[in-house]
């Protein structure tokens, strides 16, 4: 606590006076550009990894970056989503998972959690679809690899939950909302973007980031590419669906390559 108190003192005596005009503007209202939904994990700082300034992100954080579907017990996520889009007119949403996620590890031992941490057990029910998909379709992988598969699949599951909200469906229909699925790799600092799946009809940009072909990283057969400051972001353009997707390497690695079983249901964009 002493470090926190010292930090508060430094903020009030040093940082605040040199940014007084900014805080006076904040007192008049907020105008964030992006709704950023991510995990409560202490190793993730949305403003740090995106190099965003104060007031640029409207952030929702919880264990596992979960989004209860519309109509589920209200834990605050739904109200925050509705406020961000309806009141603040945010047009971009990022759902960001991360490597080594403790919540995803918990999904693999859910029955044990029911006794040890019943509240966590109840909360993770919002990721049951992710758990069932992975356990039914990814047999034969080691635990560490399954965690990383869960991380990626969970991002897509939560995007589907997000799309159950009336305000989200309405803005998607109007073309006024874009949804992005990201995976932050704690060990490398790299952020990967997942493209929409073949079952999606709208709402998730299909590879708006373009890389030279040699640098493109295919994960789970999706178009998943590193997002770095050197990469130019172009407006999304329609991409042809590629029926055959290059297979991942034979040796599965939890740092980047995910499993081949998902290739049949995933789009992959062309690098240009």
Curated annotation (Swiss-Prot):
A single Gene Ontology CC annotation of this entry is:
carboxysome
Q: Which residues bind Zn(2+)?
A: 39, 98, 101
Query: InterPro entries attached here?
Result: Beta_CA_cladeB, Carbonic_anhydrase, Carbonic_anhydrase_CS, Carbonic_anhydrase_sf
Describe the reaction catalysed, as an equation: hydrogencarbonate + H(+) = CO2 + H2O
* Record-listed E.C. numbers: 4.2.1.1
Entry's induction text: Carboxysome size and components vary with growth conditions. When grown in ambient air at medium light (50 uE meter(-2) second(-1)) there are 14 units of this protein per carboxysome, the numbers decrease slightly under low light, and increase under high light and high CO(2) (at protein level).
Top-level class of the enzyme under EC nomenclature:
lyase
Q: Where in the cell is it found?
A: Carboxysome
As cofactor, the record names:
Zn(2+)
Entries under PROSITE patterns matching the protein: PROK_CO2_ANHYDRASE_1 (PS00704), PROK_CO2_ANHYDRASE_2 (PS00705)
Q: Which keywords appear in this protein's UniProt record, sorted alphabetically?
A: Bacterial microcompartment, Carbon dioxide fixation, Carboxysome, Lyase, Metal-binding, Photosynthesis, Zinc
One Pfam family in the UniProt entry? Pro_CA
Its BP terms in the Gene Ontology are:
carbon fixation; carbon utilization; photosynthesis
On cofactor binding, the record's note says: Binds 1 zinc ion per monomer.
Q: Which family does it belong to?
A: Belongs to the beta-class carbonic anhydrase family.
**Name under which the protein is recorded:** Carbonic anhydrase
Q: Which organism is it from?
A: Synechococcus elongatus (strain ATCC 33912 / PCC 7942 / FACHB-805)
């Amino acid at each position: 606590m002493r470090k926190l108190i010292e930090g508060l003192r430094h903020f009030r005596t040093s940082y605040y006076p040199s940014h007084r005009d900014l805080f006076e503007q904040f007192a008049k209202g907020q105008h964030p550009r992006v709704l950023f939904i991510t995990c409560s994990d202490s190793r993730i700082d949305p403003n740090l990894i995106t190099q965003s300034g104060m007031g640029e992100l409207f952030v929702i954080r919880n264990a596992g970056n979960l989004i209860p579907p519309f109509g589920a017990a209200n834990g605050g996520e739904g109200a925050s989503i509705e406020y961000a889009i309806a009141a603040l007119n945010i047009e971009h949403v990022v759902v960001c998972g991360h490597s080594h996620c403790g919540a995803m590890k918990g999904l693999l031992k859910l029955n044990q959690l029911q006794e040890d941490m019943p509240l966590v057990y109840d909360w993770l029910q919002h990721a049951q679809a992710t758990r069932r998909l992975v356990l039914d379709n990814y047999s034969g992988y080691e635990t560490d690899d399954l965690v990383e598969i869960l991380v990626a699949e969970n991002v897509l599951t939560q995007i589907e939950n997000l799309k159950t909200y009336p305000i989200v469906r309405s803005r998607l229909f109007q073309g006024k909302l874009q949804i992005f699925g990201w995976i932050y790799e704690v060990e490398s600092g790299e952020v990967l973007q997942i493209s929409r799946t073949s079952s999606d009809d709208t709402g998730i940009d299909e590879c708006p980031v373009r890389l030279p072909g040699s640098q493109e990283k295919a994960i789970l057969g999706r178009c998943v590419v590193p997002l770095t400051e050197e990469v130019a972001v172009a407006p999304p353009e329609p991409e042809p669906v590629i029926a055959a997707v290059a297979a991942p390497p034979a040796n599965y690695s939890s740092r980047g390559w995910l499993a081949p079983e998902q290739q049949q249901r995933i789009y992959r964009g062309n690098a240009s």
